[in-house]
Structures are given as C-alpha cells and as structure tokens.
Amino acid sequence: MSKIRVYELAKELRVPSKVLINVLMDEFGVEVKNHMSVIEDEDAALIKELLAGSEANSELVAEYEAELAEEVNNAAKKKKKRKKGSEDDNLEQDVEVIEIGKTITVKELAEKLNKPVNDVIKTLIFTGVMAAINQEIDFETAEKVAEKYEVAVYEKEEENTLEEFEEETDVEEENLAKRPPIITVMGHVDHGKTSLLDAIRKSKVTSTEAGGITQHIGAYTVEVNGETLTFLDTPGHEAFTAMRARGAQITDVVILVVAADDGIMPQTVEAINHCKAANVPMIVAINKMDREGANPDRVKQELTEHGLVVEDWGGDIIAVPVSAKTRENIDTLLEMVLLTSEMQELKADAGRKAKGTVVEAKLDKGRGAVATLLVQNGTLHMGDSIIVGSTYGRIRAMFDDSGKKIKSAGPSIPVEVLGLSEVPAAGDRFTVVKDEKTARNMAEARKEKIRQESFATSHRVSLEDLYSQIKEGSVKELSVIVKADVQGSVEAIKASLEKLSTDDVKVRVIHGAVGAISETDITLAAASNAIVIGFNVRPDNNAVAASERDGVEVKTYRVIYDAIEDIKSAMIGMLDPEYKEVVLGTAEIRATYKISNVGTIAGGYVLTGKLVRNADVRVIREGIVIFESKLASLKRFKDDVKEVNAGYECGFSVEKFNDIKEGDIIEAYTMEAVQRKEL
C-alpha cells in the first residue's frame, strides 16, 4: 500500500503542516510526530474529503489556525524574556522546503540545507554514498540526506526544457518578416553540382576582400536582384537526408542538377525520392549545355518517368538549361529560385531568441569546437548562451561566410561560432537560453535522456508490431523501400504493395531501385521510418551495421508473393513469426579447385561469425543471391570439422553447386524458432 508524507499532503490541501498534524491527531487519532511522518493513502483520502473546501471544513481549519496563532503569540512573549540569541526549541516552525533539480552538487546541497559541507558528506557516507564536495548526486540521494535534517525536498520542474523550446508556437503574425530562402543542390556524381555552386558563388557572392576569397563554412549567401539567397554547400542528398533523420527540415528549395548529355542516373533517382519524401519543391538545372551531346528534351522525357513533368510540357516543375562552365542561364536559374521561394511566402520573427540547425561542425586544433549554425528564427547574438543537441556553450566569437567577425545574425543566415563545450552533430537543433547554467543543465538532461533511450526498445516500425501500432493510431502510413536484382521485380513489387492500402494505413513505396541494399537506403529508411525489402539481393556490411544502429528493419525474400503476404498479414494482425533467420557467419572465396567425381571445392576465409557443417548457405555474387543450398563438407587442412570461426581459413563444398568463383561471399544461416507474439 502506498504512503504519503504529511508535508506533501499539506501542500496539496494548501494548509499549514501544523494544522494538518493537529487534525490528524485530534480528528482521526493518527499518530504523527512531525511533518516528515508518513500516513496511509486511505487516511489521506479521508482527510481530503474532510478538508475539501466546504464552509464547515474551512471553519475547522480556521479554528486550528487560531489555536496555533495563540501558541505562537505565547511563545513570542516568552522569547522576549530570554537572553538574546536563544531559541524556542518547543516552537516548531513551519515546514522547511527546498527545491532542487534532477542533480545537485554536494556543495550546493549543503548551502541549501544551511549545513556545513563536512556534515553533509558524513551523512552521505552513512547512506552508503561516497561523494566529494563538487561531485553531483541525484535527486533520490539528496532527498535521503535532507530527510536526516528533517527538510522536505521537491524536484524542481525545469523552467525551460528543450522540448518546450522546440514546440514554441506563440508566433505573433505582425512580427513576422520575409526571410531569405535556403537552397540545397543535389544530383548524380559528376553531373556538375560543385561546378554549379562555384559558378553561382563566383558570379554572385559579395566580395569583401581582394580576390573574392571566401572561407568554407558549409553554407554561403548570394545577392540576386537585391534579395539574399542562402546555399547549403553540403555533399549531396546523403547529408540532406541525415539531417532530416535528426528532425532538421532546413531546406526550402532543392536544385536538382542533371547533366544534359547523361540524363537521369541512379543517384538522380535517389535525390528525387529524397525530395519527395521531404516534400520540398524542386527546380531542375539541366547542366552541361555547352557539350556537343547535350539533349535537354531527353532529360525532360526521363523526368516524366519519375513523376516530374516540366512546365514546357504542361507540368509544374521548373527546368532551366544551364552551363556551369560558361555561366549560361545562371541568372535565370537564380531568378527561378527566387520565384519559387516567393510562392512559399517564407517568413520568420527576427525579434525573438534564435533557433536553428547545425550545418557542419569540427574540432579545430587552435579554436576548439567550431560549428556552422544556420539561424532559422530569431536573431543570434555574440555572448548568447545556447543548447545544441546534447552540448552547450556561450558564443565567444561569430563569423560570416566571408570570414568576417560579426556580432549578430538574423533568420536564414549561416554563421561559424566558437565557444561550444563539445563538437555537435550535423542536423542538431540549437536554441538560445537565458544563461549558461540553464544550457548546461538542459544538455546534461538531454544526455541522460539519450542514454536511457539507447537502452529502450526501438520504436521504428516493423512488421511484427505494425498491426498494434495501427490500432494505437501511431502509424497512418507504411513507407517501404524496395531493392531487387532486376527492374521488373521492382515495378511488380511497387504495384502490388500499393494495392494493399486500406482506410487505416496507406502503403507507400518511397524508393525503388536495382542493386544490393546500401547504407544510403538505410539512411533514407531511418529518416522516413520505413521498412527495407530486398528481392534476391542482400545488404552490404555497411548497410547491416547502419540498420542495427538506426533500428531499421530489413526483410529479404526470394518470392514476391511471400513479401506481399507478410505485409498483408501484418496489417490485419495475423503475422505469425514462428521462425527467425539468424546469420551464423560469412566467408569469402579465395581459391577454387575442381576435383573429378567430387565437384568444385572452395578455399575460403571466414570473415564474420562462423561456418557450421550442414548449415544452410547462400552464395552471393556482387550483392546478388545466385544460389541457396547447404554446406556439403567443411575441412580445416585435411581434417573434417564441425565449424570454423572468423579469422581462419577452411575448405568446403556447397551441395548441388559447382559454379563457385573467387570473390563470392558464402553466408551461413539457421532458422531459429522464436516465441509467438500476440498482436
């Protein structure tokens, strides 16, 4: 049965602790010694009924208060007759209450208790805690110490939590003013992203130094027709998606660069899907128009195959033919960016405390932690205290994109700052707080929260818990990434999955492509809370590590029907995961030997885990599964063995398969029975 302390109940009922003690003893016959005594919840409930606001009960409280007042007056008269400095030990003062945060140093606790530090340390030792004067202790430990001194402790609610800052919605419409748009450039490798950025920078960056030398801080601003544009100089869509995975939606417009002589390429498709998933408007820059084989109409045709119809052909996608080399139509492209941003009516309040996102960060040998911050709302000033993810600091110096020292930066302006305690991660949100102590406390709270979340079960969507999440209303849309060995399979799967959509949940294929499952696929899945499905393909080592780190579910199949049935069963709550595939180990083929009447024997090196004789195996060539069978034999030197661990060489043969080649990967796995889950 739970209990409550007298002072806690007194605070809840808004009556003095002494009044409550008298009521307990006189009216209920409950023996209590002082405000730290505990009473049963049943007694507390009865007292709440008695003292819950009626006039009679108010009179009862007033009666006891009058008696107490008389006692106090009598005690005061006696006190005058005593020597100066003596105390009335018989008069119990009202409850002494202190408030502390989730943690407090021993020195601060001693000051709050008004006790010598040595006494507090001794009390800590008696409670089994060894702590030095500047060491932090948690709230529970501080409460035990305070209890020894008969002092009540309340846990102070953080005045400003990061979540409250993030969720601030009290926007005054009249304070909003136009802000510059933030642009990211994406596209396939070698299609001219960097060249285009350089062309824009050279033609439009306002030079403040001889030669127009600018400092690379990951972002820069340009002037177009009196308007400012902010460009993020990030390495393609990987950084864009990594930021989005951390909750940082900072881009207003995306320039998709497509080479006029090359057309749509795999990374172009990825970039298109990333933009669609983020719901960010796109402008297509058809680059390399100076080349002989340039064919913009072919690019426009290929764009339509991915749901992007340009304005020339009756669509709403702006396409501008440009040349980064000759700077042809660069001005037109920038004007189109301005037009697109004007349609969005981008606004921010420059008068409030600054909030924004980390674009990039590094540890500089001479300057310490250096971060490029993009202000998204408010104005950032030198000397401001900020919380950035799980780090904090006070801005000691601030530089613009030309390396010039500045004192403040408004919305959509990138700045490089010094003064952070640690190097933050790209995509971390920053918020200005009232002082450095508040920032430190919030950073510590965030670190503790991250530590606890690392032990908690991942809340990423998975087939096993999909139905229950749908019922709870936490999943309205199931996002899927499809990878297969041939394009026909990708199209068939996309069509079949999208037909499964119901009123409760919509199935959406956000990306489909040919090839092995890569780390980029996992990053997109993490950002979009998606499931990755592979057909006759496997994830590479980086993808496996990323999926485990980010909690992304990767499912692989050999038969399309099985995948459709799995997702369908999950949606109706009938998925029955009786067996789970467990990868035992992988080995790389380094030599092959053909032996008459036996077949092909492979010499391999075990990369991870172990190979077990008679285990199920799959042969993987360039990321694609080409055969599934069993290990027919397993030898170490000339001896038959049951298993070979990672780091050792071995010889083996695969049952009914002789087309083994050097460089093939053998993946051994087993199907383990797992306990059935109720969905």
UniProtKB/Swiss-Prot annotation:
Residues 212-216 are annotated as: G2. Residues 187-194 are annotated as: G1. Keywords: Cytoplasm, GTP-binding, Initiation factor, Nucleotide-binding, Protein biosynthesis. It is found in: Cytoplasm. CDD domains: IF2_eIF5B, IF2_mtIF2_II, mtIF2_IVc. The keyword tRNA processing does not apply. Its main location: cytoplasm. Residues 233-236 are annotated as: G3. Residues 323-325 are annotated as: G5. Residues 287-290 are annotated as: G4. GTP binds at residues 187-194, 233-237, 287-290. Residues 178-347 form the tr-type G domain. The keyword Hydrolase does not apply. Gene3D superfamilies: 1.10.10.2480, P-loop containing nucleotide triphosphate hydrolases, Translation factors, Translation initiation factor IF- 2, domain 3. One of its GO terms (molecular function) is translation initiation factor activity. GO terms for cellular component: cytosol. One of the essential components for the initiation of protein synthesis. Protects formylmethionyl-tRNA from spontaneous hydrolysis and promotes its binding to the 30S ribosomal subunits. Also involved in the hydrolysis of GTP during the formation of the 70S ribosomal complex. Belongs to the TRAFAC class translation factor GTPase superfamily. Classic translation factor GTPase family. IF-2 subfamily. This is Translation initiation factor IF-2. The gene is infB.
